[in-house]
Regions:
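N-terminal cap/leader regions of alpha/beta-hydrolase-fold enzymes
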Residues: 1-237
Length: 237
């Protein structure tokens, strides 16, 4: 059975925040930061940590809304979840959240369960953009970005991304246009250790099984197969 515990992460400015940690049954492995959607540190995001642990990774999901409300985790299944989530996102200091995610990455590397201090990052929705920003501003060993709507406007940072990176998008995404997806693809075209996938019929947040408006089971399964293969090749256990 995987081991689950809460981690306490201290930022450079002294702010302390929680993280949900899942250690694989083997007891050790490379690390992966899991960055939340706009709904916060939800059961879905905790489930992603469990999925990564099943692949052999030590997964840590930091509570990046902690500077607003340390306990917030919205239920995507409730009708008021979307407006509440957009309200939280509008209050979020994104550059600070990127710094906090990088602090979580540094913290993860210090844990005894993380082999050789190796750690990467994966993010979904809001977290897809944050994962990209951390890849540009910090030093993860790998980055996986699911439908990060903030990425197209920040492609000037693409040259600062030096780790292997995987992008997953849906072609029916209401928040990321075909032109924006193509711009991301072009920014990374021809670079080694980079993958770009677009899933037919899939909306934003297609991986989230608790978000019935968006979930696309077939696309989610394909994307996770691609993610697993990418990590196995570029960031092996």
């Amino acid at each position: 059975m995987p081991q689950i515990r809460e981690e306490r992460i201290r930022a450079a400015d002294g702010h302390e925040f929680a993280g949900h940690l899942v250690v694989p049954e083997s007891g050790s492995g490379p690390g992966m930061i899991v960055v939340q959607e706009i709904f916060g540190l939800t059961d879905y995001i905790k489930g992603v940590c469990t999925r990564l642990s099943e692949l052999g990774y030590v997964a840590l999901a930091p509570a990046l809304y902690s500077r607003i409300d340390p306990d917030v985790a919205l239920d995507e299944r409730q009708p008021d979840a979307m407006p509440l989530a957009f309200g939280m996102m509008q209050r979020l200091d994104v550059p600070q959240a990127v710094r906090d995610a990088a602090e979580a990455l540094a913290h993860l590397r210090t844990l005894p369960e993380v082999r050789d201090g190796r750690a990467g990052i994966i993010g979904f929705c809001l977290g897809g953009g944050i994962a990209y920003f951390v890849a540009a501003d910090s030093d993860p060993d790998v980055a996986v970005c699911y439908y990060g709507s903030a990425i197209p406007a920040e492609l000037g940072r693409a040259g600062k991304v030096h780790c292997p990176v995987l992008f997953e998008f849906g072609d029916a995404d209401e928040y990321i246009s075909a032109e924006q997806r193509e711009a991301v693809k072009q920014a990374f075209e021809g670079r080694p250790h980079t993958e770009f996938h677009v899933h037919s019929g899939a909306n934003h947040a297609f991986d989230n099984h608790n978000a019935s408006l968006f979930h696309h089971p077939e696309a989610a399964a394909r994307a996770w197969e691609e993610t697993s293969a990418f990590l196995s090749r570029e960031f092996p256990v």
